[in-house]
Structures are given as C-alpha cells and as structure tokens.
Design a protein with these regions (language model features):
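Glycine-rich anion-binding loops of enzyme active sites
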Residues: 1-83, 225
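Acidic, glycine-rich loop-and-beta core segments that form the ion-binding/anion-interacting portion
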Residues: 63-112
C-alpha cells in the first residue's frame, strides 16, 4: 500500500545517493499490488546509466608486478551477503536480535551496524582518475575479494594481499565467530571492510592516496601489490 510518508523517505534516500554520485534522478514510478505483497512491505529497484569516451576507458594492458593496490574502506556489509547474515544471526526467527548491542560493535545495535548505508565512491575516484594513471578498479560487492578483484586484473597478474593489512571492522569478525564461517568463505562473500580497490603504478601510489585523503576518503590505504600469477593471493 502506498504510504506517502514512506515514499517520501525512500525518494529522499535515493536523491541523497544521486548527490553523492553526482548524477541526476530522472524518473521513476510507483505501483501498488494489493493481494500480492504484504501491506507493510515494498520492493525497490533502480539503475544508473553511464557513458565514457572511448579514449578514457580504463585499460589494464600496462599492469605489471610491483603496481600498488589501494583500498577504500567500506561502511559495512554494503548490501551484499544478507542471505548469510540473516542465517548467521537467525534474524527471520528472532528479529529482535537486531536491537541487541554486542560488545564488539562499540555501542551500536546489530541492526545499525548491518544497515549502515553503502558508501558511494564516485567523486574521490574521479579525482584520482584526473591526476593518476589508474590501471584497474574493482568494486567489492557480492563475491568478496576472490570474485571481484580479478575482474580488473590483466591476464598473468594476481593481487597479492597480506591478510594482516586488511583493516576489517569488528562486525565481520562477529559474523565469522557467530556463524562459524571459514576465513576463505568470509573473503569470498563479504567486502571485509574494503569497498573498492584501485591499482596504480608504485611511483604514483602516494599521490593517489593524497588525492583520496583530500576528497572524502581519509582512511584509504595500501592494501597489496600486483604480482605474477592469477586471481587473488591472501597470505
């Protein structure tokens, strides 16, 4: 059922996302489906369309061993892996668990930690692209490190990452402990605190970090390096 106040809040959130992404909200529609969905539930879908000049399309052809992988921190689970999240915390059977305050979360409720808005990286990344040779970008969504980082790698190159260098928030450690999830499955499902990675030449890594730090990503850091091989090596 269409509740104007609820619709207004949804559109407000979408509009804020558009501001962060520096794009326009150009349309939309609302349809009511009585009898098909519970009265207090709704389904939201959207998409963006981007255009890039051919000469500006990123190429990984010059990617080589020694290039540096930079991490842009996430704000949380970033809308991915929620089927596993619900299973781990038994949310469907006990929704009140969302109001619990595990010691690991520093005073936040579980619900607050899980529903932290997904960070939008458009503006800081565009600033880096203006001044640095970027050889690859990977958005760490569903599939975690193992499925997303390889998408930007040149054939014959691997991403070598020291697990000790990954700044993983307490929420992920809590999920792993409660759910008894293997380390591999955690890195193959969740972003583990890294929402996006950018690969740049080693000699431009400091400059790229300076740009990120000055444009809304003060906690961006060096995550790993490119080496010979395939896929992702977590060591």
């Amino acid at each position: 059922r269409n509740v104007p106040e609820k619709i207004a809040n949804i559109v407000k959130g979408v509009a804020e996302g558009c501001v962060q992404a520096d794009c326009a909200l150009v349309g939309g529609e609302t349809a009511e489906h009585p009898g098909m969905m519970p009265e207090d539930e709704y389904d939201l879908a959207g998409f963006t369309v981007g255009v890039v000049d051919k000469e500006k399309i990123l190429s990984n052809e010059t990617m080589a061993a020694g290039d540096v992988i930079l991490a842009l921190p996430s704000t949380g689970v970033h809308s991915n892996g929620f089927s596993l999240v619900r299973k781990v915390f038994n949310i469907d059977a006990d929704p009140d668990v969302l109001f619990s305050t595990p010691a690991e979360l520093g005073g936040k409720t579980l619900g607050e930690a899980l529903l932290a808005p997904t960070k939008i990286y458009v503006k800081p990344v565009l600033k880096v692209l203006e001044e640095v040779q970027v050889k690859g970008i990977s958005h760490i969504t569903g599939g975690g490190f193992y499925e997303n980082i390889p998408r930007s790698l040149k054939k014959g190159c691997c991403a070598r990452i020291n697990k000790a260098d990954v700044r993983t928030p307490a929420l992920f450690h809590l999920m792993q402990k409660v759910g008894g999830i293997s380390e591999h499955d955690m890195f193959n499902t969740f972003n583990m605190g890294v929402g996006m990675v950018i690969t740049v030449p080693a000699e431009q890594a400091d400059k790229a970090l300076e740009i990120l730090h000055a444009n809304g990503e003060p906690e961006a850091y060096r995550l790993g390096v490119i080496a010979e091989g395939e896929g992702v090596e977590l060591c």
